[in-house]
Structure formats: structure tokens, C-alpha cells
């Protein structure tokens, strides 16, 4: 289904819940490549997430099987049974309402043009900023509690919640530009990004576990075929057997330096993307709950490309 809107057009694809929004002024010859690129990224992430969850589920089954006899001993002792109950949170007590308050977004003053050389002598041939040519989002597993992208300013907000009843959620979203060339060129692509995040993780006792993870990622694709990818993982936490941890927002930090490299050929459309992801997974122990919830706010300030003939 295609829905036209003031900001472009929205594509609802198959597979993961995929939404692509393309600006009205993007040339028609770029649109198919943009859609194909987002579908490729979504399939790739779905396969990776599914593998990770399957491995974790299999491991949890082994751990809870071993914890079963211990659970029977605990139930036979009043003090131990009370202690287990006290350590076991209710998922509903930790399910967050969708925050309505906007983050205090950093101020951005982007000056387009060539960037000065760095210590690595990287001189950008072209700098891209908002408004981006298109934006995209998808999720795997349970729907996210927040998934918001705005290509006009580069702002991203996303959050997930998982517990033993809804044991995983994986959300991705971001922006991109479409490029063409009239000659063979090598490209080195970088990005300037800022993020802030928060999470709560509780791994249930007696074999339970919970994981949160998030960060930002860059990709380059040729006519929808992945040619380069890089990740900047901003956080990951996995707890088990009654462990619990809360991290509040710490303030905006600049992303680590990552780079994608590829070769551009005439007659093809290249998509250069930057986005964010948040993942949460929770598996309860024997008679216990596990909870994983996380939120990431991201700001994409610029994409830079260095072209070499």
C-alpha cells in the first residue's frame, strides 16, 4: 500500500514492518533503488535478530531445565520462597508509558562545503545534511514503544520493551541520500552523529536473562545491493539470575568514528544511509520474570563523502 503525504510517499513493505518515506523532489530514477536498499537492510537485520534470539532461547531452555530442581527446593522453604518472590518484579510495574516530553536536542549549525583535513587527511568532497532524501524504519518481534524519525532535521527517537511474555523487540530507523556518478570513483563515507540513551534490565532468577543493545549504523548500497556497512554500538547490557541495572540519560555524546567504503560506477544508483537501532530481549527463569527496556535518542548531523577518481 502506498500513502501520499506532504513529506513524500510512504511504502509499506512485506517481511518486517517496513516504512519508507521519500521526499517529493527525489528524481524518479532513484526511487526504486531507495526502496530496494531499505528492503535489503531490513531483511539483513531480521535475519541477524532472528538468529540471535533463537540462540538465546535455546540457551535459556538449558539454564531453566537445570534450575528446575532448585526451584522445587526453594518452594519447600518458606524463607527462600519469600526471597524469590521479593526478587521477582511484575512486568506491568516496569512497562513505561510513551514519553511525551521531547528531548533537549543539541543545536546544529551545518555549513555545507568542503571539510578541513583531519589527522587522517580526510577531506570531504561533499557534505550532506537535513532535509534528507528519504527516511525509513522497520521492526522485528514486538512493536517498539517509540519509533520516530524526522528527515527534515535528522532527529531519531526509538524505544523497546521486552519481557517473558513478549520476549524480544528490535527497531531500526534513519535517513539516506541517493547518489549517481558519470565516472568510476572510490568513495569513503563518514557521518557526524550524537546520541543519548537509557535502559532498565532485569534478568529473572533461576535461569532468566535479559539483554538491551543500541547504537548507530551506516550502509552503502548499489541498486539495492549492500556493498559496505559499519556499526557504532553505543551500549549493550546482558544480565541474568536476578541481576538488575538501571541507567538514566547521561547527556549527548558524539558517535565513534566509523567509515564505509565503496566504488561508484556510472549508470547505477547508490544509497548512502545512517540510522539507529535498539534491541531488547527477555527470557524469564523458572517462575520468575525478566525485563529489558531501552530508549535511544539520536541526531544525524551530517553525512560526508570523499570521492577519489
What are these regions (language model features)?
Residues 2-309:
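Mature extracytoplasmic or otherwise solvent-exposed domains
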Amino acid at each position: 500500500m502506498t500513502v501520499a503525504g506532504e513529506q513524500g510517499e510512504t511504502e509499506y513493505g512485506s517481511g518486517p514492518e517496513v516504512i519508507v518515506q521519500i521526499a517529493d523532489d527525489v528524481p524518479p530514477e532513484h526511487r526504486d533503488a531507495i526502496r530496494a536498499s531499505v528492503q535489503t537492510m531490513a531483511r539483513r537485520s531480521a535475519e541477524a535478530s532472528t538468529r540471535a534470539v533463537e540462540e538465546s532461547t535455546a540457551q535459556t531452555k538449558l539454564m531453566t531445565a537445570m534450575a528446575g530442581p532448585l526451584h522445587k527446593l526453594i518452594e519447600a522453604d518458606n524463607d527462600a520462597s519469600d526471597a524469590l518472590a521479593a526478587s521477582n518484579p511484575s512486568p506491568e510495574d516496569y512497562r513505561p508509558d510513551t514519553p511525551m516530553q521531547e528531548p533537549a536536542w543539541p543545536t546544529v549549525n551545518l555549513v555545507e562545503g568542503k571539510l578541513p583535513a583531519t589527522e587522517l587527511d580526510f577531506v570531504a568532497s561533499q557534505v550532506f545534511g537535513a532535509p534528507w532524501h528519504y527516511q525509513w524504519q522497520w521492526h522485528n518481534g514486538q512493536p517498539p514503544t517509540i519509533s520516530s524519525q524526522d528527515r527534515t532535521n535528522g532527529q531519531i527517537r526509538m524505544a523497546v520493551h521486552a519481557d517473558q511474555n513478549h520476549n524480544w523487540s528490535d527497531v531500526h530507523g534513519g535517513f539516506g541520500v541517493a547518489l549517481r556518478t558519470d565516472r568510476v570513483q572510490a568513495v569513503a563515507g563518514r557521518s557526524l552523529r550524537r546520541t543519548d540513551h537509557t535502559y532498565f534490565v532485569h534478568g529473572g532468577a533461576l535461569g532468566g536473562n535479559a539483554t538491551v543493545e543500541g547504537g548507530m549504523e551506516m550502509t552503502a548500497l548499489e541498486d539495492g545491493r549492500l556493498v559496505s556497512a559499519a556499526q557504532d554500538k553505543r551500549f549493550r547490557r546482558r544480565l541474568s539470575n536476578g541481576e538488575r541495572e538501571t541507567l538514566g540519560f547521561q547527556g549527548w555524546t558524539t558517535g565513534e568514528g566509523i567509515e564505509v567504503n565503496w566504488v561508484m560506477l556510472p549508470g547505477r544508483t547508490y544509497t548512502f544511509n545512517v540510522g539507529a537501532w535498539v534491541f531488547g530481549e527477555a527470557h524469564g527463569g523458572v517462575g520468575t520474570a525478566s525485563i529489558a527496556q531501552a530508549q535511544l535518542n539520536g541526531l544525524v548531523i551530517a553525512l560526508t563523502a570523499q570521492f577519489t577518481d
